[in-house]
């Protein structure tokens, strides 16, 4: 099989290329049955194009960086991110990652061979390879030079469990958003300067609802919609029985008050009554409420303003007022939004526009930080600046909460042996509940209830994310949004709805790409920066080598580590690049010199692992340092075809498209199949925990590779979800392969007995009986239609056409009706016609089915030509794809039969 694969390259040398890109799997996890599905689709079209006369290079790849690897190593070593650099050095940790990431290579290789997937495993691209990384650096420098790379302090999705920020495409992986039941509260924000009618009955409050009560201590504003109608309502607090006047959106009045109680005498209410009377005493537009002030709801910490130099001053007098926001709706809540600028992008935006300060803590280093640390818990007092604590923290109130986890998922006690015990965590009291109970006791809660809402989770830890302020590097992908949309319209998506829907809508709502990852094992961001803000983006190892020489001359470095290791700039051999390591911690030790003579340190971040895989069209070739011509002249770029699961729509498919658009103003692929999920026979997602996962090795062992492949391709279109049922595989084995094999077994003994070796000239069509002319007409119609289906990336239609021809036309009609012609004595012209007709049908079917069922097709074809010598190839996969003979097609005859 390997020799044949190699021959398929050498024999097609000089032929037109069909360019295929292999999406890199990660070898730190075992392959699953869904990989058989995806690889069968890829293999089918690459084999088909080879038979059509194209040179199809298929370079394998390994995705070796990123969170999946790091979290697996942390679990294996029994450590957390905080231990790296303390109990284990970064060098030791990364060495463990490098080793771990390839641990299942043997199993992947084994599956590749057993399922008959042709891909060049001897010369794979590996994303941790220094030459691969160098191309990534070159691409980043192109983005940097186009002003498409920038640094920003913004609110981003952040995974405390993984210890890093996440990009929007990571957050939109399937299953990341899920329904959760949380404790929610409608808080009472006591007014400082109420309107007169708001003071006539009890204490006046604004009502604001939140699904994250733990963010209430960080509240610094309330936001109203400018055109929304609001009402002032006289009533009682249902928990404390205290008189109050509350303000909320008019359309939501009856969501919080029982309509039956409207107009009941306020004076008649007694605590405990089911109906709490209420009376509307005022109506306002949102604009009428702007500027009204309220008391800080949970006054643990006073807000501060921080200037560019890190100096801070208390700023409570600028906070705690009502501001405007166009995004406020009356779909749920109270129509008044609680604003915590440190924990929400919209919150930060409207607060900044209105001059509202954020609620920052100042740590020991003098740095502003949100109230929650990077592990997901409230800061400890002894981690904070003493002056800040003295002037801005109510220690008596806050100390009870210091160190508390804002979500139980982040608490290490609920993670045992690296596995999160979600059930136990859900049953324990949460910080949200604790805060709500405290608010209830102090008359600050209007309503507390459980609420099911859709909340994002980390794609690798399965734990909730926070929206958190981080200093990160971004790719300005929004600048290329219109061009990405335009180029996407030129791509042939299968199905089309994925391109216009899931992918197209994603592009229309594009955000800038958060590139930074605060981790250790990955591609280092090649940007060096001085404290004064001077920057240098490095685009090659040679450039870095030369900049180190400048740094040595300036006295910031004593030696060039690359020179010491014998690295020769400009020599692109594997041996030369293996002398160095571009990963952390070694790259962090390099100090460069700015144009003004200041020291520059590397920005500590790694880059998003999805950039690694999205750059593979260029990095697999070490472009532009090598193979520049085949990319620039478009002979090996863009891809004619790629295929992966639908989950890659906002992953690999997007990053390929984004990088290609922004750097090359091109598509990265012309045709793409996004295959559906492989579910169990009942339509449930497969998982080891549920015991319904299918082992691909066991399935191939039990049923064979070809029946498995044929079943997956013909059962449903690749882009539909496949309900995997072993009964279906067995049916394919029996009905299709069994029927075809029985047809060959019928033919071969009679042909051998009569000495048929196809040495005679073809019996003219005019001398053949009608049934021969009919089956050959059907055969050539089949060739034409199957060829069209393969060419249109419709493998299911192709497979079903072949299936129907074999079962119905060939076996059920032709062989059944012609048996006596083969049984007859003598070697008549009629018998020869029957042999020639059936032989051509079998030989052609072997070629047509070869892309989907490579093993059986090859066996059948080689058995046939071994006797006749009609073809001199080492495999059916080196044969030419059948060509339809239009002169043989007789549609009238086909219809009549």
Which residues are covered by each model-predicted region?
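Core structural elements
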Residues: 111-113, 135, 513, 713-715, ...
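Gly/Pro-rich turn-and-neighbor structural signature
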Residues: 122, 129-177, 182, 188-194, ...
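N-terminal, positively charged nucleic-acid-binding surface of large information/translation enzymes
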Residues: 1-241, 340-345, 350-353, 360-376, ...
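Catalytic alpha/beta core of large soluble enzyme barrels
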Residues: 228, 232, 236-365, 377, ...
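Conserved oxyanion/phosphate-binding beta-strand-loop segments in alpha/beta enzyme cores
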Residues: 1-21, 67, 74-78, 95-111, ...
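Conserved phosphate-binding loops in nucleotide/dinucleotide-binding enzymes
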Residues: 339-342, 598-609, 628-633, 640-644, ...
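Catalytic adenosine-cofactor/nucleotide-binding cores of aminoacyl-tRNA synthetases and other
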Residues: 366, 457-461, 645, 677-682, ...
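Acidic, turn-prone loop/beta-hairpin segments
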Residues: 63, 156, 166-178, 529, ...
């Amino acid at each position: 099989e390997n020799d044949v694969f190699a021959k398929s390259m050498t024999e097609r040398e000089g032929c037109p290329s069909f360019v295929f890109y292999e999406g890199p799997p990660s070898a730190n996890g075992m392959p699953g049955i869904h990989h058989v599905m995806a690889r069968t689709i890829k293999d089918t079209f690459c084999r088909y194009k080879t038979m059509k006369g194209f040179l199809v290079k298929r370079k394998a790849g390994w995705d070796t960086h990123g969170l999946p690897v790091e979290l697996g190593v942390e679990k294996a070593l029994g450590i957390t991110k905080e231990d790296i650099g303390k109990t284990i050095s970064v060098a030791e940790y990364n060495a463990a990652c490098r080793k771990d990431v390839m641990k299942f290579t043997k199993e992947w290789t084994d599956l590749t061979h057993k399922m008959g997937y042709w891909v060049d495993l001897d010369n794979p691209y590996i994303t941790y390879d220094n030459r691969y990384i160098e191309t990534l650096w070159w691409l980043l420098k192109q983005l940097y030079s186009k002003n498409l790379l920038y640094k920003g302090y913004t609110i981003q999705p952040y995974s405390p469990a993984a210890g890093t920020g996440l990009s929007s495409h990571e957050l939109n992986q399937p299953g990341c958003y899920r329904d959760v039941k949380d404790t929610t509260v409608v808080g009472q924000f006591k007014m400082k300067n109420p309107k007169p009618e708001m003071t006539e009955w009890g204490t006046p409050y604004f009502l604001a609802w939140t699904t994250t009560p733990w963010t209430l201590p960080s509240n610094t504003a309330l936001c109203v919609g400018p055109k929304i109608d609001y009402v002032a309502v006289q009533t009682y607090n249902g928990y404390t029985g205290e008189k109050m006047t509350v303000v909320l959106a008019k359309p939501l009045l009856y969501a919080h008050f029982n309509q039956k109680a409207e107009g009941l005498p306020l004076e008649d209410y007694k605590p405990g009554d089911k109906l709490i009377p209420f009376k509307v005493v005022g109506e306002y537009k949102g604009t009428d409420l702007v500027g009204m002030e309220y008391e800080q709801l949970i006054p643990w910490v006073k807000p501060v303003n921080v200037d560019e130099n890190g100096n801070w001053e208390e700023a409570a007098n600028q906070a705690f007022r009502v501001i405007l926001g166009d995004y406020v709706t009356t779909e749920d809540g109270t129509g008044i939004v609680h604003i915590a600028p440190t924990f929400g992008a919209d919150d930060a935006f409207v607060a900044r526009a209105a001059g509202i300060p954020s609620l920052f803590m100042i740590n020991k280093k003098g740095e502003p930080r949100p109230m929650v640390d990077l592990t997901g818990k409230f800061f400890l007092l002894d981690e904070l600046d003493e002056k800040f604590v003295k002037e801005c923290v109510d220690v008596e109130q806050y100390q009870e909460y210091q160190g508390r986890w804002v979500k139980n998922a982040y608490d290490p006690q609920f993670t045992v042996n690296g596995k999160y015990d979600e059930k136990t965590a859900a049953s324990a009291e949460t910080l949200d509940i604790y805060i709500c109970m405290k608010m209830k006791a102090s008359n600050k809660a209007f309503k507390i209830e459980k609420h099911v809402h859709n909340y994002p989770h980390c794609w690798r830890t399965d734990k909730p994310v926070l929206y958190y302020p981080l200093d990160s590097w971004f790719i300005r992908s929004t600048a290329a949004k219109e061009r990405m949309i335009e180029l996407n319209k030129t791509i042939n998506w299968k199905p089309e709805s994925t391109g216009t829907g899931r992918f197209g809508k994603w592009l229309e709502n594009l955000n800038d790409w958060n590139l930074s990852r605060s981790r250790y094992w990955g591609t280092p961001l090649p940007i060096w920066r001085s404290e004064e803000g001077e920057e240098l983006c490095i685009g090659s190892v040679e450039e870095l080598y030369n900049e180190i020489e400048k740094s040595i001359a300036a006295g910031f470095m004593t030696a060039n580590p690359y020179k010491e290791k014998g690295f020769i700039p400009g020599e692109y051999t594997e041996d030369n690049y293996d002398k160095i390591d571009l990963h952390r911690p070694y790259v962090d030790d390099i100090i460069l010199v700015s144009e003004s003579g200041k020291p520059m340190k590397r920005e500590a971040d790694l880059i998003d692992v999805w950039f690694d895989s999205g750059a593979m069209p260029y990095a697999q070739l070490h472009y532009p340092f090598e193979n520049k011509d085949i990319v620039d002249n478009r002979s090996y770029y863009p891809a004619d075809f790629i295929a992966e699961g639908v989950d890659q729509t906002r992953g690999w498919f997007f990053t390929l498209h984004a990088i290609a658009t922004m750097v090359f103003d091109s598509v990265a692929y012309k045709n793409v199949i996004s295959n559906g999920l492989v579910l169990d026979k009942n339509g449930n997602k497969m998982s080891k925990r549920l015991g319904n996962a299918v082992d691909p090795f066991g399935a191939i062992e039990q049923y064979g590779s070809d029946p498995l492949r044929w079943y997956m391709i013909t059962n449903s279109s690749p882009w539909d979800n496949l309900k995997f049922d072993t009964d279906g595989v067995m049916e394919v084995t029996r009905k299709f392969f069994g029927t075809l094999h029985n047809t060959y077994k019928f033919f071969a003994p009679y042909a051998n007995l009569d000495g048929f070796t196809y040495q005679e000239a073809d019996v003219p069509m005019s001398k053949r009986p009608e049934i021969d002319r009919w089956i050959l007409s059907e055969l050539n119609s089949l060739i034409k239609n199957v060829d069209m289906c393969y060419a249109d990336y419709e493998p299911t239609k192709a497979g079903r056409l072949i299936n129907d021809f074999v079962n119905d036309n060939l076996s059920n009609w032709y062989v059944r009706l012609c048996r006596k012609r083969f049984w007859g004595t003598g070697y008549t012209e009629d018998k020869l016609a029957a042999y020639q007709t059936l032989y051509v049908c079998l030989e052609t079917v072997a070629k047509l089915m070869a892309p989907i069922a490579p093993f059986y097709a090859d066996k059948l074809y080689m058995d046939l030509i071994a006797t006749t010598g009609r073809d001199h190839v080492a495999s059916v996969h080196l044969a030419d794809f059948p060509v339809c003979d239009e002169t043989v097609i007789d549609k009238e005859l086909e219809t009549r039969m």
